[in-house]
Design a protein with these regions (language model features):
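Signal-peptide-cleaved, periplasmic/extracellular N-terminal interaction regions immediately downstream
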Residues: 2-253, 258
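Soluble periplasmic/extracytoplasmic beta-strand elements of cell-envelope proteins
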Residues: 45-49, 66-72, 96-100, 108-112, ...
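Active-site-adjacent mobile loop/cap segments within catalytic or ligand-binding domains
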Residues: 56, 344, 395-481
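Short connector loops/turns at beta-strand edges and beta->alpha or beta->beta junctions
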Residues: 74-76, 265-269, 343, 451-455
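Conserved NTP-handling cores and scaffolds of large molecular machines
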Residues: 75, 117, 142, 296, ...
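Short acidic, glycine/proline-rich loop/turn micro-motifs
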Residues: 81, 271-278, 456-462
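Catalytic-core regions of hydrolytic enzymes
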Residues: 190-200, 210-389, 400-410, 473
Length: 481
């Protein structure tokens, strides 16, 4: 009996110690592991990564515009203080921020804003290399219109791009344009200016702004999601009537613009594949996309000027559905998604081109790769509670047989040109799988895996400027065929 009582006391003491440790763990709260800021014209994202889920409340304040975020259950840490230095002068939305211990176990971050924003605040569960993430996305009250962005870019380039219609020869390997009478001095994108000036229907009212006197500072404010980024597409631009005396042949060469949507994969929180020497896919494909954009903007097809539109032009994350929406908004004629993926073994090598499949993947490797790419939203971070995210997913279910057939032709032309620069091909024909980013119903769409970044030799090639230039040349010729 005495031994049994001693054993019971030992167990009780052990339980008390375990309980005390549990209380200590709860009192300690979450540990902040890292903070990141991703500024972009579309929106600015602030990510706070921790070893446990964070609870937060937020308050929007006007005059001047500010956003206060209270993070509960933590103490101010050096990692959180790093946020102050991560705000860049060129951030479109954040002018600066302050961070401090607002109350015991409550850290407050106050964002001083350059303009009124519509914030989305949500949590992401651990995935890939990330632990728990608290995400703050700051959107403008009026969503960025991709068509207006394309117009603005065209206007910026106008002083140095006046002779783009005759510059096909600027692309390596492309034949010089034949001599022809000068076309009318018009910019096909210019006609869109008037169309964009008058939008159908009244603009959506901005979300309510709560001042400090209207609501206690410790209470959360219901946040209205930003308006959808895609509005009703305007009619395809056409040139004004040709002056008397000009031939019909000349007029027909300037009656429209050919828009190519370039989609550099991944970005922001999502680095994509990482090579053995640390090369990040998101960086390489953005560089290739910029080089290809230069070639497209300097080219024409049968006299019709070409224009490239990038779904992202900097290091920020764009959800898969939004990439498709952007391409449709600018009425793209082609969609080219650029990647440089990895495989489970470094022996995998060679470039590949993929089109959409409605009836299963053409190979097990294609299926594996499609599943991997379709998980990009999980790593990049999508607010699944946002209604617009559901709308975007619905958009991706309307692919057509005609679109797929045209995509296969485009992909075949690109494969031939990539082989022509001496690059190794992983497969000699266009493969097919259910890539979500290729599901625009009305745009021929391909996904180009430029190489396997997991292969040391191909990783080194992808880092070389001359290789990127040759690759951009090959893709350009494939587009023009």
């Amino acid at each position: 009996m005495k031994g049994r009582g001693l054993k019971r006391r030992v167990l009780l003491q052990g339980g008390s110690i375990a309980l005390m440790l549990g209380v200590h763990q709860i009192a300690r709260g979450a540990t902040i592991l890292a903070v990141r800021v991703w500024p972009a014209a579309d929106y600015t994202r602030v990510t706070i990564e921790s070893d446990a889920r964070l609870s937060s409340q937020q308050l929007v304040v006007g005059s001047p515009p500010r956003l206060a975020v209270d993070i509960e259950g933590i103490e101010l840490s050096p990692e959180l203080r790093e946020l102050v230095g991560k705000i860049k002068p060129g951030d479109p939305y954040i002018n600066g921020l302050r961070v401090g211990q607002n109350a015991p176990k409550v850290v407050r971050i106050v964002f001083d804003l350059k303009q009124a924003v519509v914030p989305q605040v949500f949590s992401l569960a651990p995935v890939a290399a990330y632990k728990h993430r608290l995400v703050l996305d700051l959107y403008p009250e009026q969503a960025i219109d991709p068509m207006e962005a394309l117009i603005a870019e065209r206007l910026r380039d106008a002083p140095r791009g006046g002779n783009s219609n005759n510059s096909s020869a600027a692309v390596a390997g492309a034949p010089p344009a034949p001599a022809r009478p000068a076309p009318p001095a018009v910019d096909p994108l210019g006609d869109l200016m008037a169309q964009q000036a008058v939008r159908p229907g009244p603009p959506a009212p901005p979300p309510p702004v709560v001042t400090g006197s209207e609501r206690p500072t410790g209470l959360p404010v219901p946040l209205t999601p930003p308006p959808p980024a895609v509005a009703a597409a305007p009619a395809r631009p056409v040139a004004p009537p040709v002056a008397a005396g000009r031939g019909d042949a000349t007029a027909s060469r300037t009656d429209r613009i050919i828009i190519v949507a370039l989609d550099p994969g991944h970005g922001g929180e999502d680095p994509g594949a990482i090579g053995p020497n640390g090369t990040r896919e998101k960086d390489i494909v953005l560089q290739v996309a910029h080089r290809l954009r230069e070639r497209i903007n300097a080219s024409s097809v049968n006299g019709s000027p070409m224009r490239a539109f990038l779904t992202r032009d900097a290091d920020f994350f764009v959800p898969l559905g939004v990439r498709v929406q952007k391409a449709r908004r600018v009425q793209a004629d082609l969609f080219v998604s650029i990647h440089a993926d990895a495989f489970t073994t470094p022996a995998a090598r060679g470039a590949s081109v993929f089109a959409l499949s409605q009836s299963g993947a053409s190979s097990s490797a294609a299926r594996w790769l499609a599943n991997k790419e379709n998980d990009a939203d999980k790593v990049g971070g999508v607010n699944v509670g946002n209604h617009e995210a559901q709308v975007q997913r619905a958009l991706l279910d309307m692919s057509t047989t005609a679109q797929i057939n045209d995509s296969l032709k485009l992909g075949g032309a690109m494969l031939g040109e990539i082989k022509g620069i001496g690059a190794r091909l992983h497969k000699g024909q266009v493969e097919q799988a259910g890539f979500a980013v290729l599901k625009a119903p009305d745009i021929p769409s391909v996904l180009v895996e430029t190489a396997f970044i997991s292969n040391p030799e191909e990783e080194a090639n992808l880092r070389r400027v001359d290789y990127q230039e040759n690759l951009a040349d090959a893709l350009m010729r494939g587009i023009q065929r």
